[in-house]
Structure formats: structure tokens, C-alpha cells
């Protein structure tokens, strides 16, 4: 069975501001890439953290059957949230340890639901450090943001 890996990244021009997300999905056998799929999208008014979350959500939601995969992100927010903080948030009714509402709760709940169908290993890597998969995810995120940046809209937007 091939290994499934998703590199995810978010980008934002201003925070908040126009943003994009990207995910590079790869099925691999050792070092051989068997299949690759690129996903991207964006929003006109968002934050970097929301785009990071949407990248991971989109990767998971793109899978049409329960899968085992590794999600590689340069977002400590996503990695720490999904592997550590979320358990407490859920126990506290989606409130932080200081009893404040969890920011981006809509996306955290969506990520929780999307992850529940799969067996996921989460890995954090340093962003903009020359890691090929992460650099491609960053490129996709910036491409997803491009239509929402001022002066970059097409004639239909």
C-alpha cells in the first residue's frame, strides 16, 4: 500500500486580509511518487490561521475513502491544536483553559470531523526552509490568494 502524504500551507496578505490555502497530496512508494494532486483556494477577508486550517481540512475532505496519511504542516497552531489543545477544548465545550471561546471554532470543528474518518499522523516542519513539498504547498497557497488581492481580480471578479 502506498504512503499518503499531504503538505499543507496557508498564506495571508495582511492579517486579516486576502488569503489562500494550498495542499499538495502525494501517494508514494518509498521515494517514488505514484500520484500527485494539487488543491488550492482562498478568501477575500481572512487570517493566516484560518487558511492554515482550511488547507488541512481540504486535504482530508479530498479523500474519498478512509485513509491513513501524514499531514505535514509548517503551522504550529494547526499541529498543536489538533494534537494537543483540541482535547481540552472539546472537554470544556469549545472554550480555552481560560474559559474564552476558541478562535476559529467553526474550522476546528470541521477539522475534527474531517480527521475522524482517517488515521492521521501530524508532523510540523519549519516553513520556508527549502523543504520541497512545503515550498509547493506555499506556492499553491499564494496562487489561491492571488484572485483576492486588490488589483488582481479577473474580469468576472
Curated annotation (Swiss-Prot):
**GO MF annotations, alphabetized:** magnesium ion binding; nucleic acid binding; RNA-DNA hybrid ribonuclease activity
Q: Which GO terms describe its cellular component?
A: cytoplasm
Cofactor (UniProt): Mg(2+)
The UniProt record lists the RNase H type-1 domain at 1-146
Which catalytic reaction applies to this protein? Endonucleolytic cleavage to 5'-phosphomonoester
The residues listed in the UniProt record as binding Mg(2+) 1, with positions renumbered to this chain, are: 9, 52, 74
What Enzyme Commission number(s) apply to this enzyme? 3.1.26.4
Family per similarity comment: Belongs to the RNase H family.
The record describes the protein's role as: Endonuclease that specifically degrades the RNA of RNA-DNA hybrids.
Share what the entry says about its subunit structure, partners included. Answer: Monomer.
**Protein name stated in the entry:** Ribonuclease H
Q: Which organism is it from?
A: Jannaschia sp. (strain CCS1)
